[in-house]
């Protein structure tokens, strides 16, 4: 078996010394083990005609390219993030479909296939990541590539009622069948994909996870992404920076509810604020004795939907503090800024409650990081949305419906008053799962399964080859 070739929308620079998150950690671990290539967008626009930038370190090579302003707008902003992202997070009301954006999305996937093709070797295995690159295997197949190609979707896959509302849904489904292995975060996501596929064409299934559709054979499997628990525990348990140590001392008699999420409508942040207000309403005995800190750095600030949610959170935070605050006590701290990941792990460790309640999330690694950062002898309690992929694994968390403010409020009260023995027991069960299903286990399982797939024959490629771009009727 040859090299591993990883393809993602963005690549982590080889000289990046910062704390890498989910995808980067898993990809780097896999590439170091197998040797290979990481191919993706540089994050820069302009000078798109210049040659690929290549950097080699040992047995690993990074190859990156620039996008034109038009390609960036149509492929990334207008289709990936204004059509696929909201739809896959069950927000059809926020989808802004435009035909030029769909054509740009298709064009860039074809362009990327053209750029990668000269770099490929016959025995490479190719691992493609996330919703930006749904047509990528199809474009490679058109160019005669019969290598094993796997795909992992980091975000949820919506039900047919949602997915089939997208005008190019049928084309996207057929393109996905050009992958040999399709990986999902949860069983619900895998089944939602198969349900959407079955609504459009005849699907033949052998066993439970080997399928054929449109004359193409592929496998589906569930691979819940993990974290590096040992690394997080080490970051969390180290000495505190002076300002954080001072803050901890000042809050020694206050119970801390802590939450950190990217500012995104899928994270359920307004609902979180309302649930905290319900806690203050229902359980006045906590007044002056708790503090909820929400860190939510700006994401996609140029998009109106994200501007709206930022303004909503600022308004809600001011209203709640104005209603319940006292001299010397501010019940809610909302910080719209970025903090170093290592610092956040230390904050997790001294927090009494981790509040992770997205409305829809593929996995949510923050939930796993909170658990890994805790002191096993005196752990905090995780309150977790039933709609986060992590809820399928972290069953000892307090699982809540984020749309039910009273349900979340009751869970917060229970977390704040939970006896030490129960906290230790729940934490130990979750930590065991996180250690067992860490980031290395995730990537090793996926690559092992991809290697086990039989390569496609030249006859199959010729039969399925399409000469033109997909167009909407």
Swiss-Prot record:
Q: Which residues bind UDP-alpha-D-glucose?
A: 21-22, 262, 267, 339, 365-369
Major enzyme class: transferase
Keywords (alphabetical) are: Glycosyltransferase, Transferase
The answer to whether keyword rRNA-binding applies is no
Q: Where does the record place the site Involved in alpha anomer selectivity?
A: 85, 155
What EC number(s) does this enzyme carry? 2.4.1.15
Q: In which pathway does it act?
A: Glycan biosynthesis; trehalose biosynthesis
Q: Which reaction does it catalyse?
A: D-glucose 6-phosphate + UDP-alpha-D-glucose = alpha,alpha-trehalose 6-phosphate + UDP + H(+)
Molecular-function GO terms, alphabetical: alpha,alpha-trehalose-phosphate synthase (UDP-forming) activity
Query: Which residues are involved in binding D-glucose 6-phosphate?
Result: 10, 76, 130, 300
Q: Describe, as the record does, how this protein assembles with itself and its partners.
A: Homotetramer.
- Say which family it is in: Belongs to the glycosyltransferase 20 family.
Q: What does this protein do?
A: Probably involved in the osmoprotection via the biosynthesis of trehalose. Catalyzes the transfer of glucose from UDP-alpha-D-glucose (UDP-Glc) to D-glucose 6-phosphate (Glc-6-P) to form trehalose-6-phosphate. Acts with retention of the anomeric configuration of the UDP-sugar donor.
| Protein name stated in the entry | Trehalose-6-phosphate synthase
Species of provenance: Citrobacter koseri (strain ATCC BAA-895 / CDC 4225-83 / SGSC4696)
Lineage of producing organism: Bacteria, Pseudomonadati, Pseudomonadota, Gammaproteobacteria, Enterobacterales
Write the gene name. otsA
């Amino acid at each position: 078996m040859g090299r591993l070739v990883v393809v993602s929308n963005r690549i982590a620079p080889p000289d990046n010394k910062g704390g890498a998150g989910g995808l980067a950690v898993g990809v780097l671990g896999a590439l170091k083990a197998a040797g290979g290539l990481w191919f993706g967008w540089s994050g820069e626009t302009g000078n798109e005609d210049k040659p690929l930038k290549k950097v080699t370190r040992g047995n690993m090579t990074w190859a990156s390219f620039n996008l034109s302003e038009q390609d960036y707008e149509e492929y990334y902003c207008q289709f990936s993030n204004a059509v696929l992202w909201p739809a896959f997070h069950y927000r059809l009301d926020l989808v802004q479909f435009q035909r030029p954006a769909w054509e740009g999305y298709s064009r860039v996937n074809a362009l990327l296939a053209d750029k990668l093709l000269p770099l490929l070797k016959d025995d490479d295995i190719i691992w493609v990541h996330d919703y930006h690159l749904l047509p990528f295997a199809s474009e490679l197949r058109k160019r005669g590539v019969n290598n094993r190609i796997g795909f992992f979707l980091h975000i949820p896959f919506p039900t047919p009622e949602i997915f089939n509302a997208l005008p190019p849904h049928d084309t996207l489904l057929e393109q996905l069948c050009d992958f040999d292995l399709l990986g999902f975060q949860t069983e619900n996501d895998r089944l939602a994909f198969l349900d959407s596929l079955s609504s459009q064409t005849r699907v033949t299934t052998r066993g439970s996870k080997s399928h054929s559709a449109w004359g193409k054979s592929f496998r589906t499997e569930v691979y819940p992404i993990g974290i590096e628990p040992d690394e997080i525990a080490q970051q969390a348990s180290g000495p505190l920076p002076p300002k954080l140590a001072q803050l901890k001392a000042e809050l020694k008699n206050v119970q801390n509810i802590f939450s950190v999420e990217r500012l995104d409508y899928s994270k359920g942040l307004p609902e979180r604020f309302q649930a905290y207000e319900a806690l203050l309403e229902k359980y006045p005995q906590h007044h002056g004795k708790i503090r909820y800190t929400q860190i939510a750095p700006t994401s996609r600030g140029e998009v109106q939907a994200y501007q709206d949610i930022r303004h909503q959170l600022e308004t809600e935070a001011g209203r709640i503090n104005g209603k319940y605050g006292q001299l010397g006590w501010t019940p809610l701290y909302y910080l719209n800024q970025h903090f170093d990941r290592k610092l956040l792990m230390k904050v997790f460790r001294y927090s009494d409650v981790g509040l992770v309640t997205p409305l829809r999330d593929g996995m949510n690694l923050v939930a796993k990081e909170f658990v890994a950062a805790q002191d096993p002898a005196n752990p905090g309690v995780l309150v977790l949305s039933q709609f986060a992929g992590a809820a399928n694994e972290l069953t000892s968390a307090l699982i809540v419906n984020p749309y039910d403010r009273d349900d979340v409020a009751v869970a917060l009260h229970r977390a704040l008053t939970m006896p030490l023995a129960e906290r230790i027991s729940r934490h130990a069960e979750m930590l065991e799962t996180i250690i067992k299903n860490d980031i290395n286990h995730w990537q090793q399982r996926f690559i092992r399964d991809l290697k086990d797939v039989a390569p496609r024959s030249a006859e199959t490629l010729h039969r399925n080859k399409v000469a033109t771009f997909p167009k909407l009727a």
